[in-house]
Amino acid sequence: MDSLHVSSTSVLVDVVEAVETATSLVVDTAEAVATEQATPTAVISNALARSAYAAHTSLSYLAWAFGLWFLRLIGWVCYGIPTYVLGLLGRTINISLQFSSLLLILIALVTVVVAVVRYKYLTVYSRLPQEQPRQEPEIDMYDESDNEDEKTGFANYFDEFLSAVKIFGYLERPVFHELTRHMQTWKLSADEMVPLDDEQGFSVVVEGTVQVFAKQSSFVQNPTSVPDSRKEDSIMFNGERYTLLSEIKNGAPLTSLFNILSLFTDDLQLHKNFDSAVNSPMTSASDVPNMSLSSDGSDDLQKGEPQFGEPRLSEKPAAKLSVTVRAATDSTIAIIPAAAFRRITKKFPQATAHIVQVILTRFQRVTFQTGHHYFGLTPEIFQTEVNLNSHARNELPGYLREGAVKKLNQVYDASQMGGRPKKYTVTLNKKNKGKGSRRQRFSVQLNNQGHLNSQSRMVSLDSLEAVGDHMNPGDLLTNVPLSRQGRPVFELSSVKHKASIQNLSFSGNDDENEDTALRTALVEAIFKVLGIDRDSIQSSIMAVKTMSNTASPMFTGATTGGSSGSLGEELRSRRTGQDSLGASHFGVGLPSERSQNSFYARSETSTSSVDEDSLMAAPFDTIRNDVAQYMDVVLFKKDSLLIKQDDPTPGLYYLIDGVLEVGYTDHHKIYHDLYTVQPGGVGGYIGSILGHRSFADLRARTDVYAGFLPRAAIERMSDKYPMVHLTMAKSLTKVLSRLLLHLDFAMEWVQVRAGQKIYKEGQEADAIYIVLNGRVRSVAETKGDSGIVGGESGDAKDGKSHRKNLTSIGEYGKGESVGELEVLTLTRRPSTLVAIRDAELAKIPRALFESLALHYPSITFEISRIVASRVRTLMEDSAPIPRRMHTFDMAAHHDSYLTIAVVPISQDVDVSEFGRRLYNGMQAVGREACHLNHASVLNHMGRHAFNPLGKLKLSGFLDDIEDRYQTVLYVADTPPGSSWTHTCISQADCVLLVADARSEPDIGEYERVLVKMRTTARTEMVLIHPERYVPPGLTSAWLKPRVWVHTHHHVQMDLPRHEADVLASIRKMKRTGTLANLKNKVQTIQEEFRSMYRPKANIYSTSSANKDDFNRLARILSGQAIGLVLGGGGARGISHIGIIKALEDSGIPIDFVGGTSIGSFIGGLYAKEYDLVPIYGRAKKFSGRVSSLWRMALDLTYPATSYTTGHEFNRGIWKAFGDSRIEDFWLRYFTNTTNITHSRMEIHTSGYAWRYIRASMSLAGLLPPLTDNGSMLLDGGYVDNLPVSEMKAQGASVVFAVDVGSIDDTTPMNYGDSLSGAWVMWNRWNPFGRHPNVPNLAEIQARLAYVSSVGALEKAKHTPGVIYMRPPIDDFATLDFAKFLDIYRVGNKYGHKFLTELREDGKFPAIPGMENVKTKHKRTIARRNSI
C-alpha cells in the first residue's frame, strides 16, 4: 500500500512540472511580444518549438504513468488482497452476547425467512395473471324490415303477390305464367263489403287490410247466445249476421287451403256412390254399418260390441262456407280466376300434382297438426275418416272373403306346430316369378305390444302354395324373421336383400287365379272408398279430350327419361338408386338423384304429346293391375297394434273381416276411444294420404283379416298417375268436417325469413303463433345497463343509435306456440318475436279463437291448460332472490335442436369424420337423425341443386327432411364461399364450430362467413383434442376473441396434423421469436415433427360407452343431457366420491356437473378429470391438509372477520386445481356462491377454478369472504345448498342430486314468552331435564342463514326429472375430514344399493346412451311431390 502511494505521488509531481513548463513558455512569449525584443515571426517560431516539446513530454509521462498504475493494480489484486484476507483470518475475534440477544436474532432471522417463503413462494395462487373478462355474447336482431311498410307502388304490389303465391311451393315458369296471365284486381274502399265466392278463384291482399266474416248461422248453432262483448265483432249483411274470423293484411291470401284444393280438382268426378253418400244430408251414424262412434269408449270395450248410437262428432261432411270480406282500410285484392287453375290441371298435370301435394302437406301442418296438438280436436280430425267410410258398403264377395280367411287361418295353424307363442300377424304375398316379375315385396314389420303384453309378429310368405304334407312343423318359424321390437317399423325391402323365408304356397292355377282375383277386388274396393272407379276415370278422360286438343300424360302415366315402364319398374329403379347413394353408410337412405329429378324432368315435358289412342284407352285396368301387385292380405290377431300413435303410418288397411278400433292418448296420458271400423271400411287413411305420423292408434279388437297397401306404393302410384293423386285430394275435400273448414279458412300460413320480426314489443296481441318449421326467439328490452362496452354513450359521432340491452325470454321450435297469455288477457306484447332462421308459422287470429270458444268450449279448456302450465312453470323457475350468471344466459332455452350445422373453423379440420361420429352418437341416444353433406345432396338433387332455379327445389327437399326426422345434421364440407356452406348456416338452429385445439386460436375463414351472414342462431364451439386433457388457459384463448360463441364443448378425437401445419407454426415462431428462447423453439419444432411420424398413446382415452364424447354431445344437443348436482356438507361431502363410483359402475353417463361447497370441490375434480382415480387421490390429499391441526393452528388469526386467514385452505384447493379455468374442464360445470355485497346468488361458469370453488366453500366465521370485482362471496349453501333449478335451467333432463347437508332440527319449543339465560344453562347441563335444549346465539344465526336454502331444497326434491339421493352420513361432523375412508365407503355402498333398488322398483329413468337403446329402424326418405 505504501509503494502504491509513493508511485502515485511521483506521477502527480511529473504532471505538475510539465504544466509549469508550458505555462512559463506562454509567459515568455507574451513578454517578448510586449517588449518587442524580437520580431513577431521569431517569437512565434520559438513558441511553437517549445510547445511541441512540452506536449511530447506530457504524453510520455501520461503513458508511462498509466502503465505503471495498471501493473501495480494487478499486483494488488493478486498479492495484496490475499495477504490481507489471510491476515484477517488469522486474527482472533471474541464476541460476547447474552442468550436472550442471540435468541432474538435467531427469531428475527427465522421470521424473515418464513415471511419471504410464506408471502412470496406460497402465495403464487394469489398472483396469477389477471385476465380481462370476456365480452359475453349479446342478442342481435339483424332486422332490416322496419321500413318495408314505406314501400309503395308496383314494387310493393309485386312483392306482396309473390309472397302470397309461395303457398304453392315451387312453380315453373310456364305454370306461373299460366296462372298469372288472366289475373284481376279489385279496389275496395274502407268499410266496403263484398261476398267471397270460391268460384272467383285465388285471392290475395296486396294492399291494405281486409276483415273476413263467416255466416253466424253456420258457425254458431244458437246466434242469440253471442255475448255483448262479441257484438262488435259481428256485422249484418244481406239480412244475415256474420262473425269475424280473421283480419288479413297485405301479402296474405284470402283463399283457404281447402278452397285451393277445390280449384284444382273441381273438374274431376268421383265415384257416383261417393258423391251421393257424402252429399246426402240425411246420413247419420245409424245409417253407417261399417263405422261406429261411442261417447264412452271404455264401456264399449268392456261390452265388446260396436255401438251405433248418436255420435259426439259432427256427422255432416264439409260444405262450402258462406264468407264475406270487408275492407278495414282502402285495399287492393288480386285474383287468379278459377279457369286458370282448370287450365293448369289439363296442361300441366304433373305440376298440378306437385302443387296439390304441397297444399296437402301445408294443410296437414297448419290445420290437422294444429288441431291435434294444440286445440285437442283429434275426434274432429278423425271425423274425416268417419265421413269417408260412411259410403263404403262395398264388401268383398263372400267366396273371396271366405277364401282369404281360410288361407290365412291355415298359415296361422301351420305356424303353431312349432310350439311358438300364439300372437302372430300373417301376410300372404304373391309369388315372384323369375327376373321378369314386376313385383317387389314391401314388408311391413309390425312388432307391437297388445293389451295383454303380447307381441304381434308378422310372417311374410312369398307364395300362395297350399299347405300340404311336404311342409314340416316348425319350418315357418325357423326361417322367418321374427322381430321382437316394441314398436312398428316401416321398411322397404328389395328382393335381393330379403331374408331367407320358408315359403308356403297354394298350388295350382285355380288358387293363383283366385289370389289374383282377391287382390284385384281389394284394390277396386279401396279405389271405391277413395272415389275412384272406371266410370269416373273415363269421364275425366272424355272431359279432357273435349276441352283441350293438347294431349296430356295425366292418365297414361309419366315416363322417366323418355322410357315407359310399370309402377314396379319405377319402384325398382328407385330402390336401386337408394342402394348406390354414397351416404348410405351413414345409416341414411336418400332417394336417388334419378328418382328425385325425374319429377322435374317430367314436369318440364308435361306438355309433350301422346297419341290419341292412349287417351281413348281407359287406364283404369293398368292402374289397378299395377297397384294389385303390391297388395298384401294380412291376419292380425286380437289386440295387435297395426298403427301406433306418433309413428309413421305404414299404409292403408282395408278390412275384410273383424273389427278395428281407433283411439288416441292425449297430453294427460289418458286414452280415448274414437270409433270402430267394420268390414268394408279402411284404416290409416289420413296418415297414408298426407304422408305424416299417425295421430291415433289402430288396434285389432278381434282377429282381423285385411288388405294392406303400403304407403310407398301409394306415393309412387300418385307420382306415376297424377289423376289418381288429384282424385284422392278431391275425396279428402269432400269429407272434411265443418270445424276443420273454419280452422283452415281463418288460420294463416306465415313464412318469415331469418331475422324478421314477427311482432314487436308493445304491439297489440292479435294472434297466437305456432311454429311449424324453423325456430324463433322471444326477446325483451330490459332497463338498466346500456350494454355499451367501455362505458361509451350511444350518442356516437357516427350517428349510430344506442345499442339496446336485450334479454332472451325463450326460444320456440317446431310444434311450440307463443302468445296465448297476451291474447287471453287482451294485453300488449311483452317482448319481440324474431325468427332465428327461415321459419313457417301458423297464425291463429284472436277473433277465430274467440269464435271457436263460443261453440267449442273444449278449445277454451285446452288453451287455458296451456296458459296455466306456462304460468306455473314461470313461477316455479323464478328464483327466491336475484341471481346473476357470469355467462350468456341462453342455457335456459337449450332444448332439442332440429337442425344442427357442423362448420369447421378452417379447412384443415376433418369435419366429415366429426359429422359421421356425431351422427352415430345421435343414433346411439335414440334420435332419428339424418346426415346431409354436399355429396349426398348433389347425388339426390342433381348438379343443379344450388343454381338459382334449383334452390327452390332444394328448400322444399330440406323442409321435407326436417319434417321426417328428429335431428338433421348439415355438414359444411365445402369451401367457405360455397352455396352449400351458406345453406348449412342458414338452415341451422344451432351452429357447431369445430376447431383443432392444437392449432392457433385465430379467426378462421368459415367464422368470417358466419359473422358476415349475421345469423342469430345459437353458436357453440367444439374443441377437438387428441387426449382427454386441456392445458390451462387454452379454452380462454379460443373464446376471448369470439363474442359470437355462446358455449363450448371438449371432445376427444384423433385429428392428424399435417406437415403444412407444422411448417406454418415454424414460420410464425421465426417471425415472433428472439435469441433468448431459441432452444425452446428448436425443441418444439423437433417435437412437432416427431408427433407426425410417431404414434402417441392417449393418456385419458376410454372405451366406456357412457363416457363417449360424441354421445355426450348428442345428448346435450337433443335436450337429453344428464346432470349431477352435489350438495354441500363439509366432510360429509366425501361420500360424493363413492356415489360417483356407483354411478360409473352402473354405466350412467354424466354430461353436466354442478355443486355447492364441498360439492363444488368434488364436482369440479370430476368435471376436470372425468376420471375417478385422480379424483380420489386429490380429494384424499386435500382432506389430509384440512384435517392437519398444525396447519390450521398456524393459520389462525385475530377473529375480526374469521378465525383463520384462509391461506392453508386456499393452498389446499389450489394444489388440486392449479391455474386451470372452469372453461378448461372436460365436462360443463358450474358452482354457486352467495354475494353478500349485492344480496344475490351468483352462478360461475368461467374464470379461475380454485377461486370460485374456494368462494363456494367459504363458511362464514371460519374463512374470510373471497373478493371478486369488489364483491364479497361466501358459501353458496346459504342460498341454495343443492342447485337443482340451475342444473335444469342449463338443459339437463335427468338430474342426480346428492344431498349431504345436516338435517334440520325441527324439535318443537315451548319455553314461554320470556327466557332466562340461567335457566337455559341449567337445562342444557341437567341430565334429567324434560325440555329440549334452546339454541344459542350462534345456532340461531346459522338457522337464519340457511332459511332460503331449506326452501330451495324442498323444491328440488319435488322437481320433475330429479333423482334425489341422501346417503346415511349423519353420524359424521362437518370437519371430520380425517375419516376419509369411512365416509367414502358409506357413499359407495349407499350408491350401489340405491341404484339397484331404483331398477327393481321400475323407477329408473330412461337414460339415452347408457346402453344399447332400441332405436327405430332406419327409414328411407320416400320421395314426395312436395319436394
From Swiss-Prot:
<keyword id="KW-0442">Lipid degradation</keyword>
<comment type="function">
    <text>Intracellular phospholipase B that catalyzes the double deacylation of phosphatidylcholine (PC) to glycerophosphocholine (GroPCho). Plays an important role in membrane lipid homeostasis. Responsible for the rapid PC turnover in response to inositol, elevated temperatures, or when choline is present in the growth medium.</text>
</comment>
<dbReference type="InterPro" id="IPR001423">
    <property type="entry name" value="LysoPLipase_patatin_CS"/>
</dbReference>
<feature type="domain" description="PNPLA">
    <location>
        <begin position="1124"/>
        <end position="1288"/>
    </location>
</feature>
<feature type="topological domain" description="Cytoplasmic">
    <location>
        <begin position="118"/>
        <end position="1427"/>
    </location>
</feature>
<keyword id="KW-0472">Membrane</keyword>
<comment type="similarity">
    <text>Belongs to the NTE family.</text>
</comment>
<keyword id="KW-0677">Repeat</keyword>
<dbReference type="InterPro" id="IPR014710">
    <property type="entry name" value="RmlC-like_jellyroll"/>
</dbReference>
<keyword id="KW-0443">Lipid metabolism</keyword>
<dbReference type="InterPro" id="IPR002641">
    <property type="entry name" value="PNPLA_dom"/>
</dbReference>
<dbReference type="GO" id="GO:0005783">
    <property type="term" value="C:endoplasmic reticulum"/>
</dbReference>
<feature type="topological domain" description="Lumenal">
    <location>
        <begin position="82"/>
        <end position="96"/>
    </location>
</feature>
<feature type="region of interest" description="Disordered">
    <location>
        <begin position="281"/>
        <end position="315"/>
    </location>
</feature>
<feature type="active site" description="Nucleophile">
    <location>
        <position position="1157"/>
    </location>
</feature>
<dbReference type="Pfam" id="PF24179">
    <property type="entry name" value="NTE_Ploop"/>
</dbReference>
<feature type="binding site">
    <location>
        <begin position="731"/>
        <end position="870"/>
    </location>
    <ligand>
        <name>a nucleoside 3',5'-cyclic phosphate 2</name>
    </ligand>
</feature>
<feature type="transmembrane region" description="Helical">
    <location>
        <begin position="97"/>
        <end position="117"/>
    </location>
</feature>
<dbReference type="GO" id="GO:0016042">
    <property type="term" value="P:lipid catabolic process"/>
</dbReference>
<feature type="topological domain" description="Cytoplasmic">
    <location>
        <begin position="1"/>
        <end position="60"/>
    </location>
</feature>
<dbReference type="InterPro" id="IPR000595">
    <property type="entry name" value="cNMP-bd_dom"/>
</dbReference>
<dbReference type="InterPro" id="IPR018490">
    <property type="entry name" value="cNMP-bd_dom_sf"/>
</dbReference>
<dbReference type="GO" id="GO:0005789">
    <property type="term" value="C:endoplasmic reticulum membrane"/>
</dbReference>
<feature type="active site" description="Proton acceptor">
    <location>
        <position position="1275"/>
    </location>
</feature>
<keyword id="KW-0256">Endoplasmic reticulum</keyword>
<feature type="binding site">
    <location>
        <begin position="615"/>
        <end position="735"/>
    </location>
    <ligand>
        <name>a nucleoside 3',5'-cyclic phosphate 1</name>
    </ligand>
</feature>
<dbReference type="InterPro" id="IPR056556">
    <property type="entry name" value="NTE1_P-loop_dom"/>
</dbReference>
<keyword id="KW-0378">Hydrolase</keyword>
<feature type="compositionally biased region" description="Polar residues">
    <location>
        <begin position="281"/>
        <end position="296"/>
    </location>
</feature>
<feature type="short sequence motif" description="GXSXG">
    <location>
        <begin position="1155"/>
        <end position="1159"/>
    </location>
</feature>
<dbReference type="InterPro" id="IPR016035">
    <property type="entry name" value="Acyl_Trfase/lysoPLipase"/>
</dbReference>
<dbReference type="GO" id="GO:0004622">
    <property type="term" value="F:lysophospholipase activity"/>
</dbReference>
<keyword id="KW-1133">Transmembrane helix</keyword>
<protein>
    <recommendedName>
        <fullName>Lysophospholipase NTE1</fullName>
        <ecNumber>3.1.1.5</ecNumber>
    </recommendedName>
</protein>
<feature type="short sequence motif" description="GXGXXG">
    <location>
        <begin position="1128"/>
        <end position="1133"/>
    </location>
</feature>
<feature type="region of interest" description="Disordered">
    <location>
        <begin position="787"/>
        <end position="807"/>
    </location>
</feature>
<dbReference type="GO" id="GO:0046470">
    <property type="term" value="P:phosphatidylcholine metabolic process"/>
</dbReference>
<feature type="short sequence motif" description="DGA/G">
    <location>
        <begin position="1275"/>
        <end position="1277"/>
    </location>
</feature>
<dbReference type="Pfam" id="PF00027">
    <property type="entry name" value="cNMP_binding"/>
</dbReference>
<keyword id="KW-0812">Transmembrane</keyword>
<dbReference type="Pfam" id="PF01734">
    <property type="entry name" value="Patatin"/>
</dbReference>
<feature type="transmembrane region" description="Helical">
    <location>
        <begin position="61"/>
        <end position="81"/>
    </location>
</feature>
